[in-house]
């Protein structure tokens, strides 16, 4: 398979370096700022990972839990996460992005 993710790992391997992936919680700060943050970090990484905020992120560390709570407090919804990705891919169509979330959040879509 020749996905953007496999291409990113192949490019890093050719350069004899590890691939750099970053994670940010969608909606942390604001929806608009979340897109700006994602665009900004994408300039320096191989793959972006964007998390769906969850109200009980027990499997995450403290910093991600706090980010998720802020995002929820700011009104982020699951459809907003997809909107952020859609707008991001309009600008950075060749940058791989991985979505991460809890199964229980996603089955209710």
Predicted segments with their positions:
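Conserved small/polar residues in nucleotide/adenosyl-binding loops
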Residues: 107-109
